[in-house]
UniProtKB/Swiss-Prot annotation:
Name the UniProt record assigns to this protein: DASH complex subunit SPC34
Function, as annotated: Component of the DASH complex that connects microtubules with kinetochores and couples microtubule depolymerisation to chromosome movement; it is involved in retrieving kinetochores to the spindle poles before their re-orientation on the spindle in early mitosis and allows microtubule depolymerization to pull chromosomes apart and resist detachment during anaphase.
Subunit structure: Component of the DASH complex consisting of ASK1, DAD1, DAD2, DAD3, DAD4, DAM1, DUO1, HSK3, SPC19 and SPC34, with a stoichiometry of one copy of each subunit per complex. Multiple DASH complexes oligomerize to form a ring that encircles spindle microtubules and organizes the rod-like NDC80 complexes of the outer kinetochore. DASH complex oligomerization strengthens microtubule attachments. On cytoplasmic microtubules, DASH complexes appear to form patches instead of rings.
Annotated coiled-coil segments of the chain: 234-307
Top-level division of the source organism's lineage: Eukaryota
Length: 307
């Protein structure tokens, strides 16, 4: 394999994290098994191409020598005459179309599912939607929702996530119960905005202030993101979070450099202003002394004339 034991263990741990989160990156587990993501975020194809070819089949050029076009059905057939499930389904579809044109009855399905099963599944789904809607109303959100409306499944699922008693929001509130800023951020994420009073030390003009998600600090948002990733450790989201952290670190370092340069320029300007002000004050005193000397000289000349 040409890989060290540590890299193999890291890959296994990543697969385990993906399985425990019940999420498989599109297009699914086959893609995860075949495509290996390196640490720098690039896809690597080492042994995976060979495995894919082995599972998928032979080379496309070789496939043309194994199949031929049926002149009657205009579909591909194996040259050796062997048939599989696809051939059976294709033939069954043609027979059903022909029988319908002739007015014959359709063939019975291979597996027959009783109608009672579908009715029971439908009733259970309605019951689940009703229970979710009741919990949604009990939480004080959306009292005008019709409990008989079956189109509220998406709303109910979102409610489960943002429920005050259970769900991700409740877990995050318990985790950051000592952090007021993140608690306000969670409220803004849940309701779109949060209103803060001057009691919380936010406003200085004795007025309320409305904060949106973008008004919170980047450090708090990234801290909350890391906490969510601990609950849902998917490789794709981890990679995106690492990129956000890297970009934030770069921007933060650049801003610190710019602030240091600005402070240095301010200090230089203040120093120059002090020097210029001291020069101006010195020249002003000298001018006053010169005027006084001129007055004294004039008085002396007048005294001489009078004498």
């Amino acid at each position: 394999m040409g890989e060290s034991m540590n890299s193999c263990l890291e890959e296994i741990n990543g697969c385990l994290d993906s399985i425990t989160s019940l999420y498989f990156k599109p297009p699914g587990i086959f893609h995860n098994a075949m495509i290996r993501i390196s640490k720098d975020g690039k896809e690597t194809h080492t042994l995976n191409d060979k495995i894919k070819n082995l599972i998928k089949g032979c080379d496309p050029k070789e496939e043309t020598t194994l199949f031929q076009l049926d002149p009657v059905t205009k579909s591909l057939r194996r040259k050796d005459g062997r048939q599989a499930l696809f051939d059976y389904l294709d033939k069954r579809d043609l027979n059903m179309k022909r029988n319908r044109r002739l007015g014959h009855k359709d063939e019975k399905p291979v597996i027959h599912v009783p109608n009672e099963f579908y009715i029971r599944e439908h009733d259970e789904e309605l019951l689940r939607d009703s229970q979710r809607t009741k919990r949604f109303k009990a939480a004080g959100h959306g009292n005008d929702i019709d409990s008989n409306n079956t189109n509220n499944t998406t709303t109910a699922l979102i409610t489960e996530l943002f429920n005050d008693d259970v769900g991700l929001m409740a877990t995050m509130r318990k985790k950051f119960k000592e952090n007021d800023e993140i608690k306000n951020l969670l409220m803004a994420l849940q309701k779109g905005s949060v209103i803060l009073d001057e009691k919380e030390g936010i406003s200085t003009n004795n007025r309320r202030r409305t904060l949106f998600v973008e008004d919170f600090s980047t450090e708090s948002i990234l801290k909350l993101l890391d906490a969510v990733l601990e609950m849902f450790p998917t490789e794709e989201y981890k990679k995106a979070a690492e990129q956000y952290h890297d970009v934030f670190q770069e921007l933060n370092e650049e801003s610190e450099k710019l602030l240091a340069e600005i402070q240095l320029q301010k200090d230089e300007i203040e120093g120059r202003l002090k020097i210029e002000s001291s020069k101006d004050s010195t020249t002003g005193v000298q001018k006053l002394i010169e005027k006084e000397r001129q007055k004294i000289a004039e008085l002396e000349s007048q005294l001489r004339i009078s004498n």
